[in-house]
């Protein structure tokens, strides 16, 4: 038995889960929020009960030390020596990393080099890695990249039709995100379908406040909706998804905004929030739409319509599809969105059961048994993928 910590460090937060492997039992989980403030919030789950403490946590290193001390004081571990490995979520691995990797000084340097591709996320991920290195210097640590799974995309999928030297000089290409989630749910789908993943053509719909679709053929990502950044693809909670690039100078001209200000609008004030004018939260929009709010209904239709189109295009790309998977907050819980997305896909062999579609937050087939294309709801589990990669790469167990 080994104990593995899965870590997701944000600029002012630190999410954690402690697994016992190989059983994949979650021993505890929690989050440190508002790091850098006097009223930081430390939340940990012990024996199913959430315990919360508000205290000053000046930086990530202090948050890590506090986390480890709490694991001991709550009797979850007896000493730091019981931690056998640590897995860190890293948002962007660029082209350098096509798999998770053991963290060395050289690897850390390479993660820093690709940070300009994810300036909001990678620096925070690096801070988390260094904080753990300070407190647990001899424990093997693994970086698990959101982008790595999509590194199997062929050139015709990842290249933009721009001057080729923009790719060779500046690394401008599609990278894709949510890779750890897409990998988990497609592997799990193969298990539930009882077929080798090498034989399957799968479309994975990771639908949360950020959303992306992936075409996965033979267990490998061959295309995905997000691009150079997570702004591309389908409309999302606050992100626009794909737009005509000529709109950016046009909006600048009409509003007097700078390029950065327009980008801020595209990232934070667009998507379902922009169309509805009321919220980026799907639950609010479903409620408002049910009460007759036309723009809330329109926001839901636009969101579903874009996903629907990606499913059709990826089915064409793979010359057919064996299963469609819904995952993440919206994908796992919203029967309304799933119904809107699946509506009209009977022409390609998708027959789904409205009664089965009422499922929320648990694994289920929502297609009829006779449906040639199966439809599954699979709750994602990025943390367990991180723990598995630590065991695999650090030769633990």
From Swiss-Prot:
GO cellular component: cytoplasm
Major localization class: cytoplasm
Cofactor descriptive note: Mg(2+). Can also accept Mn(2+).
GO biological process: acetate metabolic process; acetyl-CoA biosynthetic process
PROSITE patterns documented for this protein: ACETATE_KINASE_1 (PS01075), ACETATE_KINASE_2 (PS01076)
Binding site for ATP: 15, 206-210, 281-283, 329-333
Binding site for Mg(2+): 8, 382
InterPro entries: Ac/propionate_kinase, Aliphatic_acid_kin_short-chain, Aliphatic_acid_kinase_CS, ATPase_NBD
Keyword ATP-binding tagged: yes
One protein family per Pfam: Acetate_kinase
Catalysed reaction equations from the record: acetate + ATP = acetyl phosphate + ADP
Subunit details: Homodimer.
Family label: Belongs to the acetokinase family.
UniProt site positions, description: Transition state stabilizer: 178, 239
NCBIfam families (alphabetical): ackA (TIGR00016)
Molecular function via GO: acetate kinase activity; ATP binding; magnesium ion binding
Binding-site residues for substrate, renumbered to this chain: 89
Essential cofactor(s): Mg(2+); Mn(2+)
Gene3D superfamilies: 3.30.420.40
This protein's UniProt keywords: ATP-binding, Cytoplasm, Kinase, Magnesium, Metal-binding, Nucleotide-binding, Transferase
Pathway: Metabolic intermediate biosynthesis; acetyl-CoA biosynthesis; acetyl-CoA from acetate: step 1/2
Localization in the cell: Cytoplasm
Active site: 146
Name recorded for this polypeptide: Acetate kinase
Membrane-spanning parts: none
């Amino acid at each position: 038995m080994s104990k593995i910590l899965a870590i997701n460090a944000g600029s002012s937060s630190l999410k954690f889960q402690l697994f016992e492997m190989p059983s994949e039992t979650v021993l505890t989980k929690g989050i440190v929020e508002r790091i850098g403030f006097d009223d930081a919030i430390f939340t940990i789950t012990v024996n199913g009960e959430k315990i919360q403490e508000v205290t000053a946590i000046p930086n990530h290193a202090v948050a890590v030390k506090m986390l480890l001390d709490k694991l001991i004081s709550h009797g979850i571990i007896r000493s730091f020596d019981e931690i056998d490995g640590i897995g860190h979520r890293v948002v962007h691995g660029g082209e350098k990393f096509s798999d998770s990797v053991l963290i060395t000084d050289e690897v850390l340097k390479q993660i820093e080099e690709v940070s300009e591709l994810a300036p909001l996320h990678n620096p925070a991920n690096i801070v988390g890695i260094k904080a753990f290195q300070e407190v647990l210097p001899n424990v093997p640590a693994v970086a698990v990249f959101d982008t790595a799974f999509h590194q199997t995309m062929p050139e015709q999928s990842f290249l933009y039709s721009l001057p080729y030297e923009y790719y060779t000089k500046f690394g401008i290409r599609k990278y894709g995100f949510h890779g750890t989630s897409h990998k988990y749910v497609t592997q799990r789908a193969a298990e539930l379908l009882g077929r080798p993943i090498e034989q399957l053509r799968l479309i994975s719909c990771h639908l949360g406040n950020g959303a992306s679709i992936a075409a996965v053929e033979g267990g490998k990502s061959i295309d995905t909706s997000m691009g150079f950044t997570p702004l591309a693809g389908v409309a999302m909670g606050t992100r626009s998804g794909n737009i005509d690039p000529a709109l950016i100078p046009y909006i600048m001209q009409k509003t007097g905004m700078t390029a950065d200000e327009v980008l801020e609008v595209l990232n934070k004030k667009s998507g379902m929030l922009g169309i509805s004018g009321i919220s980026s939260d799907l639950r609010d929009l479903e409620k408002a739409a049910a009460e007759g709010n036309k723009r809330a209904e329109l926001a839901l239709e636009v969101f579903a319509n874009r996903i629907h189109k990606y499913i059709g295009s990826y089915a064409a790309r793979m010359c057919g599809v064996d299963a469609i998977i819904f995952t993440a907050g919206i994908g796992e819980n919203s029967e309304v969105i799933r119904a809107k997305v699946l509506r009209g896909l009977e022409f390609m062999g998708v027959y789904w059961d409205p009664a089965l579609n009422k499922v929320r937050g648990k694994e289920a087939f929502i297609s009829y048994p006779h449906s040639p294309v199966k439809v599954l709801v699979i709750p994602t589990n990025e943390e367990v993928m991180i723990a598995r990669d630590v065991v695999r790469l650090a030769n633990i167990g």
